[in-house]
Amino acid sequence: MNWRSERIWIELITGSRKTSNFCWACILFLGSLGFLLVGTSSYLGRNLISLFPSQQIIFFPQGIVMSFYGIAGLFISSYLWCTISWNVGSGYDRFDRKEGIVCIFRWGFPGINRRIFLRFLMRDIQSIRMEVKGGLYSRRVLYMEIRGQGAIPLTRTDENFTPREIEQKAAELAYFLRVPIELK
């Protein structure tokens, strides 16, 4: 959801609460739980999963490897569930022409730097830079060039914008901020 008027432009950033992250976390959790149950059933010699008898998988080395993969998968899926629950990467970009200030806010991982808040003066913005990398995995990223600070990404690298969408977004933002567009 974005909100825009003559003087203020607010763009909300999704973060890690995306459908694909939910799907990967569920698939990884269920798959690793299955691996762990098969490894445990081969160790105990009892059927915890009724798909095949536990005698078909001996504990050393197949059961140990499956248990290891199950535990590793549970750690990775718990990491994904934590990033989803903390909503890492979400936030907003606020461009305020009235005050002459740009605010960029993102949620990070818990700790000292949980809240990432950047504030700039609009007169320090040199340009909006559009970086396009072609090939099999093409990516298009929008950057804001700040005097003395370098480039700050405004779009995520995993957002798949079409060339027309990224050009339109860059043109609208450059027009709103009254800065030039650079293509790299």
UniProtKB/Swiss-Prot annotation:
The chain crosses the membrane at residues 21-43, 58-80. It comes from the Eukaryota. InterPro entries: PSI_Ycf4_assembly. It is found in: Plastid, Chloroplast thylakoid membrane. GO terms for cellular component: chloroplast thylakoid membrane; photosystem I. The keyword Cell wall biogenesis/degradation does not apply. Keywords: Chloroplast, Membrane, Photosynthesis, Plastid, Thylakoid, Transmembrane, Transmembrane helix. Pfam families: Ycf4 (PF02392). It is a multi-pass membrane protein. Seems to be required for the assembly of the photosystem I complex. PANTHER family: PHOTOSYSTEM I ASSEMBLY PROTEIN YCF4, PTHR33288. Belongs to the Ycf4 family. This is Photosystem I assembly protein Ycf4. It comes from Calycanthus floridus var. glaucus.
